[in-house]
Every structure is written in C-alpha cells, then in structure tokens.
C-alpha cells in the first residue's frame, strides 16, 4: 500500500482526536465553542464576549492545507492538545522565539527616487478591485479576509513560490527543499500572531515599525544571515512607492541570484518581485486605472523572474500569470508586440517579420556604434529561435554574435558588479535583459569569467522560451515538466563546447575560433599570435563523412575593390579583427552594398570596425567567405572613398563656382590697377 494512503487515515485519526480533546477541554471549562476572528485579525466580535478568540490550526504536510476550529486559546494549556499541535502532521505555532523586541527596526530606510510618472494617455485600462473575498491563511498569523486582485503560484516537488495581491495586502511565501522557508505579509491592518500563552494572545508578528503599511517577516532564525535577510526584505516596501524602481531592484537581485546562486540573493529577488507587483497594484487600485504598457511590463517581468528564480531552486516552473488575464486583454502598442507575444505565448507567425526587422535594425545600429533596444532584440531573438526556420535561427545567431563586442561585454559586466552590491541604488530603469542581450544569446564565449558566462548563458536559454508556452508554467506535484531543448544548441549543433566564438553559415557549417585544433574540419592556425593564447580557426559541420583533417595557413591577399554599384561581391562575408595577444576584437557580417562600400573605403570609412586608423599595428584582419575560404586581408587593390550625399556634391559645386568668381574679380582688379599705374608713369616721363 502506498505511503500516502497510509498517512491519510493517520491524519484523520489525528484530527479526530484533536477535535475530541478540544471539545473535552471546552466542556470541562463549561464554555461554548468560540467563533472565528474578525477579518482584520482583531479581537472576536463583541456579540459573544464569553467565547474569546478562536484558534485556527493549519494541517498538512506541504501538499495540502486544512483549517480547523478549536476552542479558545486556553486549550493550549492542555498538554495533550499541545502535543498534537507539535506533532508530525501539524505545524508548530511557536515560530518566533523570545525576545520579540530584537526583531523590530530602529529607523525606516531612505526612500528612493521615482522612475515612472502617473498613468496618462489613451493606453489606460480599467483596474477595478474584484468583489471576491478570500481567507488568507498562514502557519503563524491569524487568518485574514482579503479582496484578491491577483494570485500566482509556481510549484514543483522541489519548491513553492506563491504571491497573493489584495486590496492593501501582499502575502508572499517561498518554501524550498534546499533553502529555509520565508514568508512576508504586507497589510494596511494590524495582524495578530498565533503565539503561546506566555507571549500573549494579542502579539503582533515581527516586523519594522508601521509606516504606510504593516510589514511582517516570518521564518526560522537559523543563523545571522537569515536574520539579516528578514530584516532587509521587511524594509523594501517603504523604500519607494514607484513600481519601476522596485522592478529595477528586482531585476538586479535576480541577476545577482543568477550569477551567484544561493539563498542570499534568492530571497531578496523573490520579495522584490512581490513588492514591485504590490506597489503597482496599489497605485492602479487607487487610480482605478493602469497604463497598458506598464501592466504588460509587470506581467512579463513577473513571469520571467519567477522562472529564473525557480530554476535556481531546481524547479522548471514559473508563474503562469499574475493578474488573472487582465494583461492579456490590454491594447498592445507596436513597440510592445514582441514582448506580448513572448509573455502570452501567442502564435509567433504573425510577428516573425517584425522580429526579423528588429534584429536587422539593431544590427545596423550596432555596427555604426549607435545604441539599440536590447530588450526588443531579446524578444525578437526568442521568437526567431523558437519559431523561425533553420536559416532564421542561424542568421540571427550570426548577427547577435557580431553585436557582442568587448565594449558591450564590459558594460554587462559592470551592471553585474553593480547588481552584486547590496548598496546599489537604481536611479534609472534596469532590466536583466540589458545584460542577457545580446551577448548571452550569441555564440561568443570568450568574454568574462567562465562561471559568470555559464550562468548567464543558462539564464538566457531558459528565458528564451515564451512565458506562455507549455512547460514554462508551474509544474504539478506529480513531477516537473521536461526541460525544453536549448534553442541555441538546436540551431547550431555542430559547434563544439570549447569554441571561443562561432559564426554559423547557412549551409549547416560554422567557422569556430578555438585554442586547440578541433577533432574534425579544416583548421587554420593564425600566425603572429602569442603562443600562450594561440588562435585556431576551423570550419566544422555535422557531416562526419566529409570530415577534413587538413591543417592550413590563411593566404595573405590584397582583395580587389568592386566598381559595380548594383552587385555586392562581399555580401554574406564576415570581417574579423584579432590581436597578436590572441584576442578576437570584433566580427562584422557584410549584409548590404552600403556596408561593402564602407569596407573598401579604408581610412575614410565611417564604420569604426572597418577603419584601420582606429586600430594598432598589432591588429590583423581576416575575411571569411560563405564557401569556407579564409583570407588574411592586407588591403583592397584600390581605395574607394565612402559615398557622399547629393547635398554635399551640390554644396561643393556652388562653393567652387563662388571661389572661381572671387578669383576672377581679384584678377580683374589687379590688371586694372597695373594698367592704370603704367599709363601715369609714361605720361609723367613724357
């Protein structure tokens, strides 16, 4: 017989005995059974003063919870009832050891600046509170009746993460197999703790002094770190009443949890996410309206961050939805269509053209050193890798790899360091996607620390799956959902694990840079490179029958410049710069005639990667052709000037004409003066 079927009768017997003991104790005192507490957790109604408060006991082993009414708190003095309360299948109510005064804060934290303004414009949506009220139960605090605005839960055998949003109420619970449980309650009303008689029947749960809200943190004092965590997270709601500032802090904490897995950042990121949703819902509830882009942002971030946090707990689960379908009914602005498609798992086919255009525009701006929307790029890459064809996926990875420069990797590393700082104040909007895009969704692995890159890459691959797709929602108690295949590995399966950088081609092969020769494929050893950091360029493919073990040297050539304005000879080629130290500086996919002309312009090029005057003498260039040819590029046979605009030509012609006119006028003046002067001299002599 299964163990679960044995536990059920035992549980029923335990409950029956518990209720019998409670009834016997009540009869012995001659007191009638008490009624439930008020919804605010205050004293019992004055209509029955003799009854006293009622004890609610939560029964269960984690998979289910039941609430039973017992007699008054006086029943706790009965040693038999106390034994049942502390039994295996019931929860202990004594979760906060004395002295309770050690849990309270001395001062409130400093409030941070606002990052977002009040909702305005035509994109407003109604945000009315529902009429449904529900009892919020917990193991340590008297039940409270809450008008629920949103409820989300991610669950698997390894962890449970629950967020309940109500009118001026937040209940957040994290129960993990690997970490100690933590619960945070934010309420406009004072709540009462279920406590032993020695601590008093009207004891407030631990938390900081009441500000705009009462904040309570419940957990186990395992060590000083857990104590400090509970004190820190209790201060979050009073730091800022701006949801965007709270979301930025949640993204920073989630980034830290991804880079350095463990309970320290996990707790902080989970509570930040809940507080951000609470601050947003409170503002929307007060205004009875919300900005559609803001609602979509909170919904998508909740699904993204919950998935990353649950994965850190060993669970392939995430919130299936936060605001119970509200966000799915809002109007979506053109700039948010890719985010909405990712968030709700919509059919990506109508959005593929927009995704391709987004990647192409981001690449064009990146090549010219201009900023681009990294978050929109991430959602576009996610759609193309999941729903685009093999050509879409490989070309997308080729572009994101080219966009991942050393400068962007350094900027992402700086954001990561700031996220790991507990004192960082996010005065500007920040998103984890600003770090993951484009480098973490590329095939470049030579920038940054190995552990950091591996963790960011794993987070990016997890985040690429649409939030509304099967397997991205919460798993059941019967077992976790199977993990989806890595979309990056699926798009380019031929790339070896030791590759520093890979450039996928359309035919199923890829150029890869490594420190040692791969097992298969023609390999080019790049000369003039530090022997401590050798660079090997190989052409690899999945076709083992055509495996070539030839070792070659790239041929140094002066490539011919093209004069045909309608034919792009070097389109689909990849331009690579590397240094003698064995560092790959940049890669550029030549995708248009304009880019080809900039490449051949040499020192006159306006694209920094192509301009040789911006690089030192130890920097060399390669040209990689789609057919697998590798050329050590010296120069082009003729230098072509970068194309100039018609306005510049017209201005030059007009300027030249004016200059000629001025010179002619000066010449006439000089000639006239000389002729007149000679005439006077002749007349004087005569």
From Swiss-Prot:
One of its GO terms (cellular component) is host cell plasma membrane. InterPro entries: Herpes_gH (IPR003493), Herpes_glycoH_C (IPR035305), Herpes_glycoH_C_sf (IPR038172). The keyword Membrane applies. Glycans are attached at residues 77, 162, 542, 604, 627. Its main location: virion. The chain crosses the membrane at residues 647-667. It is a single-pass type I membrane protein. Keywords: Fusion of virus membrane with host cell membrane, Fusion of virus membrane with host membrane, Glycoprotein, Host cell membrane, Host endosome, Host membrane, Membrane, Sialic acid, Signal, Transmembrane, Transmembrane helix, Viral envelope protein, Viral penetration into host cytoplasm, Virion, Virus entry into host cell. Residues 25-646 are virion surface. Residues 157-217 are annotated as: Interaction with gL. Pfam families: Herpes_glycoH_C (PF17488). N-glycosylated, O-glycosylated, and sialylated. The heterodimer glycoprotein H-glycoprotein L is required for the fusion of viral and plasma membranes leading to virus entry into the host cell. Following initial binding to host receptor, membrane fusion is mediated by the fusion machinery composed of gB and the heterodimer gH/gL. May also be involved in the fusion between the virion envelope and the outer nuclear membrane during virion morphogenesis. Interacts with glycoprotein L (gL); this interaction is necessary for the correct processing and cell surface expression of gH. The heterodimer gH/gL seems to interact with gB trimers during fusion. This is Envelope glycoprotein H.
């Amino acid at each position: 017989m299964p163990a679960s079927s044995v536990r059920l009768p035992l549980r029923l017997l335990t409950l029956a005995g518990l209720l019998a003991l409670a009834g016997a104790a009540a009869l012995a005192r001659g007191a009638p059974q008490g009624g439930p507490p008020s919804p605010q957790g205050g004293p019992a109604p004055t209509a029955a003063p003799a009854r006293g408060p009622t004890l609610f006991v939560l029964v269960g082993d984690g998979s289910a919870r039941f609430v039973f009414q017992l007699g008054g708190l006086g029943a706790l003095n009965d040693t038999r009832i106390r034994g049942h309360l502390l039994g295996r299948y019931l929860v202990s109510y004594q979760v906060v050891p004395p002295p309770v005064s050690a849990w309270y804060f001395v001062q409130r934290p400093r409030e941070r600046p606002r990052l977002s303004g009040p909702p305005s414009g035509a994109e407003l949506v109604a945000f009315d509170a529902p009429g449904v009220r529900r009892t919020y139960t917990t193991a340590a605090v008297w039940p409270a009746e809450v008008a629920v605005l949103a409820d989300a839960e991610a669950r698997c055998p390894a962890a449970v993460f629950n967020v309940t949003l109500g009118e001026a109420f937040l209940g957040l619970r994290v129960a993990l197999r690997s970490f100690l449980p933590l619960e945070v309650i934010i309420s406009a009303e004072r709540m009462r703790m279920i406590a032993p008689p020695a601590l008093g029947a009207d004891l407030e749960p631990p938390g900081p002094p009441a500000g705009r809200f009462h904040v309570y943190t419940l957990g186990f004092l395992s060590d000083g770190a857990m104590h400090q965590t509970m004190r820190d997270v209790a201060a979050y709601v009073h730091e800022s009443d701006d949801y965007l500032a709270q979301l930025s802090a949640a993204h920073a904490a989630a980034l830290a949890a991804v880079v350095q897995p463990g309970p320290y950042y996990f707790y902080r990121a989970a509570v930040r996410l809940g507080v951000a949703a609470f601050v947003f819902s409170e503002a929307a509830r007060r205004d009875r309206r919300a900005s559609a882009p803001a609602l979509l942002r909170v919904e998508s971030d909740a699904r993204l961050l919950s998935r990353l946090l649950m994965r850190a707990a060993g669970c392939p689960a995430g919130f299936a939805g936060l605001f119970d379908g509200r966000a799915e009914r809002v109007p979506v602005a053109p700039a948010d269509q890719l985010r909405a498609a990712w968030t709700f798992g919509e059919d990506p086919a109508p959005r593929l053209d927009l995704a391709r255009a987004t990647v192409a525009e981001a690449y064009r701006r990146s090549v010219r050193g201009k900023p681009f929307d990294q978050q929109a790029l991430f959602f576009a890459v996610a759609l193309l890798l999941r729903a685009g064809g093999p050509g879409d996926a490989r070309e997308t990875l080729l572009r994101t790899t080219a966009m991942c420069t050393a400068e962007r990797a350094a900027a992402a590393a700086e954001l990561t360091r700031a996220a790991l700082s507990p004192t960082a104040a996010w005065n500007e909007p920040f998103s984890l996607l600003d770090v993951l895009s484009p480098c973490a969704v590329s095939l470049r692995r030579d920038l940054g620390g190995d552990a950091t890159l591996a963790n960011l890459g794993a987070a990016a691959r997890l985040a690429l799956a649409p939030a509304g797709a099967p397997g991205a929602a919460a798993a059941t108690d019967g077992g976790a959902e199977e993990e989806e295949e890595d979309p990056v590995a699926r798009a380019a399966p031929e790339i070896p694990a030791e590759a520093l950088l890979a450039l996928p081609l359309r035919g199923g092969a890829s150029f890869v840079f490594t420190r040692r020769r791969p097992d298969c494929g023609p390999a080019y050893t790049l000369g003039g490179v530090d022997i401590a950091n050798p660079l090997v360029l190989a052409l690899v493919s999945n076709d083992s029958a055509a495996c070539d073990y030839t070792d070659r040297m790239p041929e140094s050539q002066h490539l011919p410049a093209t004069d045909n304005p309608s034919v792009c000879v070097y389109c689909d080629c990849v331009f690579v710069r590397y240094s003698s130290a064995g560092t790959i500086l940049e890669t550029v996919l030549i995708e248009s005639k304009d880019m080809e002309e900039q490449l051949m312009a040499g020192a006159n090029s306006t694209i920094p990667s192509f301009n040789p005057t911006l690089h030192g003498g130890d920097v060399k260039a390669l040209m990689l052709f789609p057919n697998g040819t590798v050329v050590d590029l010296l120069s082009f046979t003729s230098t072509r000037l970068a194309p100039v605009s018609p306005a510049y030509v017209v201005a030059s012609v007009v300027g030249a004409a004016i200059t000629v006119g001025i010179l002619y006028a000066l010449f006439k003046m000089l000639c006239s003066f000389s002729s007149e002067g000679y005439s006077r001299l002749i007349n004087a002599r005569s």
